[in-house]
């Protein structure tokens, strides 16, 4: 393997595997490289979202390079994922959002049974977007504009007079925030939060956009949808009038380019079962 490929490979592994377990950088392409994971079984756990799996796959590849015997990953929803880690049914994940999953983390045992390690993906945004064409034509800039019946009707896809918004999967952390926002911003009379299989709903949303129809949806970035519906070209963020979170802890950063998106700017973290973390860190 040439030096350039070696460096790229090391960078890839460092980006997730080292952060996941918070172990020293022991990478090299030589056959004599140290293998801190030799003889250690490790069981990953992922959410049941294909679009999120790539981080786990990178982590597993890196851990195998470090000598760990990586077991078949388990899959479940986010609350159950953290409970499984807490109980020792799995050893690590790279899919926990610092703010969004805070209540799931605490309910699973918090720092008593779990350990947060590396920042896998910082600067994650969430918020509400609409198509730029409609935003420009009707001067829509804020989620509060949807309180106006004549504006809400622009996004009505089933004839009930309400704006149809693509929301979150039931059970996701964002579901709680979106439902809270519906009440906090007075949107319940004019906006319908359509919850279900998010990516199936987004396929319909994208199809509507391609037909030239107005669209309204919750999303987060980075993910693949932002490369299909491009910010500033196809769609724009809507601001919120104030930060209003279910926890009441509103003194957090919810700004993106001077616009309040209403959701904390988040960081995806690696989380380990505490007993497992202590075992692999012993000299």
Predicted regions and their residues:
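Bacterial N-terminal signal peptides
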Residues: 14-27
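Short, well-ordered beta-strand elements
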Residues: 37-51, 68-74, 162-166
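Short helix-initiation/N-cap motifs at beta->coil->alpha
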Residues: 49-50, 68-83, 192-204
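Short, polar/charged alpha-helical segment
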Residues: 50-69, 180-183
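Pocket-flanking alpha-helical
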Residues: 56, 73-112, 204-208, 224-230
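Ligand-binding pocket segment of bilobal, Venus flytrap-like solute-binding proteins
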Residues: 90-94, 169-244
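A conserved helix-loop-strand patch within extracytoplasmic ligand-binding domains
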Residues: 113-167
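C-terminal lobe and pocket-closing loops
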Residues: 226-283
């Amino acid at each position: 393997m040439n030096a350039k490929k070696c460096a790229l490979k090391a960078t890839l592994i460092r980006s997730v595997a080292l952060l996941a377990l918070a172990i020293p950088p022991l990478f090299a392409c030589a056959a004599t490289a140290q293998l801190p994971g030799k003889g250690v079984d490790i069981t990953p756990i992922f959410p049941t979202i294909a679009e999120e799996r790539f981080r786990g796959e990178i982590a597993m590849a890196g851990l195998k390079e470090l000598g760990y015997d990586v077991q078949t990953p388990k899959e479940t929803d986010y609350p159950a994922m953290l409970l499984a880690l807490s109980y020792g049914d799995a050893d690590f994940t790279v899919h926990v959002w610092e703010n969004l999953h805070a209540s799931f983390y605490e309910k699973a045992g918090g720092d008593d049974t779990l350990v947060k390690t590396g920042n896998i993906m910082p600067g994650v945004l969430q918020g509400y977007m609409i198509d730029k064409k409609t935003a420009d034509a009707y001067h829509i800039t804020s989620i509060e504009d949807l309180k106006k019946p004549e504006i809400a009707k622009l996004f009505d896809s089933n004839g009930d007079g309400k704006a149809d918004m693509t929301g979150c999967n039931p059970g996701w952390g964002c579901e709680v925030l979106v439902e809270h926002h519906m009440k906090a911003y007075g949107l319940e009379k004019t906006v319908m939060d359509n919850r279900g299989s998010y990516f199936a709903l987004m396929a319909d949303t994208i199809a509507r956009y391609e037909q030239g129809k107005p669209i309204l949806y919750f999303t987060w970035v980075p993910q693949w949808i932002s490369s299909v519906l491009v910010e500033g070209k196809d769609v724009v963020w809507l601001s919120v009038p104030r930060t209003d979170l279910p926890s009441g802890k509103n003194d957090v950063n919810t700004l993106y380019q001077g616009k309040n998106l209403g959701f904390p700017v988040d960081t995806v973290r690696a989380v380990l079962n505490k007993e497992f973390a202590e075992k692999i860190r012993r000299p």
